[in-house]
């Protein structure tokens, strides 16, 4: 059974000292939607815009076309092309259960959507249910992006919010520990479930695969700490940033569970 979700738009952090909270952005999304739903986007105005047929546009076109040659078996691509001041950096991170052809399909959708929503912007980011795509004229490899962040949460509340909140944080914290443990195959992604009486709680955490495991843990710990603000007692919720994200529901929401 699906539940409707309302994204709460969070203002981008203009600097580490100030956080401005913008007007809430309301949008209904079906949680159990098997399609690759658009979630949110942000066009960065600080980096300016490029002109049609400019070197920057040429480098961007080269990168996006070249990315389609990838097999997406890792579900992650970070690349750059061109010389300053027209260097373009691009990153694609697909959800942990959406590698291969699903990831490639999400790239195609995200590329066209970002260009439509942020026309000629040198920098921007777009989130879909199954991937994140980011472009920028400056390098951001291995760096936490906490300037781009938003919440999504269920409109329904559980009967015992206090206990549910404790269990939710415990599950997400456990998944974070597993996702960031040292191993030969560091995916920075983990899913799991927890029995809550007659129902189950399902969770997922993920970081961009260019982050060090310690940086990933820092990122996840930070957004999990926002549970009270985003999802207090809600049946489902998500916090998504430009570097990491988590999601929990009271029903399975992934194609596969690790």
UniProtKB/Swiss-Prot annotation:
Originating species: Arabidopsis thaliana (Mouse-ear cress)
Family named by the database record: Belongs to the cysteine-rich repeat secretory protein family.
Keyword Glycoprotein on entry: no
Protein name: Putative cysteine-rich repeat secretory protein 61
Annotated PROSITE patterns: GNK2
Keyword Transferase applies: no
Entry keywords, A to Z: Repeat, Secreted, Signal
GO CC, alphabetical: extracellular region
InterPro entries found in the cross-reference section: CRR_secretory_protein (IPR050581), GNK2 (IPR002902), GNK2_sf (IPR038408)
Gene (name only): CRRSP61
Coarse class of the protein's main subcellular location: secreted
Annotated compartments: Secreted
Annotated CDD domains: Gnk2-like (cd23509)
Domain Gnk2-homologous, first and last residues per copy: 38-140, 146-253
Span of the signal peptide: 1-31
């Amino acid at each position: 059974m699906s539940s409707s979700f309302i994204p709460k738009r969070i203002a981008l952090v203009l600097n580490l000292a100030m956080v401005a909270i913008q007007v809430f952005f309301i949008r209904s999304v079906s949680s159990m939607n098997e399609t690759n739903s658009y979630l949110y986007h942000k066009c960065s105005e600080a980096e300016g815009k490029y002109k049609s047929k400019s070197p920057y546009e040429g480098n961007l076109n080269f990168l996006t076309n070249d990315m389609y040659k990838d097999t997406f078996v890792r579900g992650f691509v970070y690349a750059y092309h061109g010389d300053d001041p027209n260097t373009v950096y691009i990153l694609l991170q697909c959800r942990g259960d959406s590698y291969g052809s699903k990831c490639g399909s999400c790239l195609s959708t995200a590329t066209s959507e970002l260009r439509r929503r942020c026309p000629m912007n040198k920098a921007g980011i777009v989130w879909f249910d199954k991937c994140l795509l980011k472009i920028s004229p400056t390098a951001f490899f291995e760096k936490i992006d906490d300037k781009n962040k938003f919440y999504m949460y269920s409109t329904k509340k559980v009967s015992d919010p206090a206990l549910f909140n404790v269990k939710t944080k415990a599950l997400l914290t456990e998944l974070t520990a597993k996702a960031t443990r040292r191993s030969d195959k560091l995916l920075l992604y983990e899913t799991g479930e927890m029995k809550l009486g007659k129902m189950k709680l399902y969770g997922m955490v993920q970081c961009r695969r260019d982050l060090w495991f310690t940086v990933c843990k820092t990122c996840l710990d930070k957004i999990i700490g926002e549970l009270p603000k985003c999802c207090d007692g809600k049946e489902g919720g998500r916090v998504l940033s430009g570097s990491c994200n988590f999601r929990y529901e009271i029903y399975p929401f992934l194609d596969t569970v690790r």
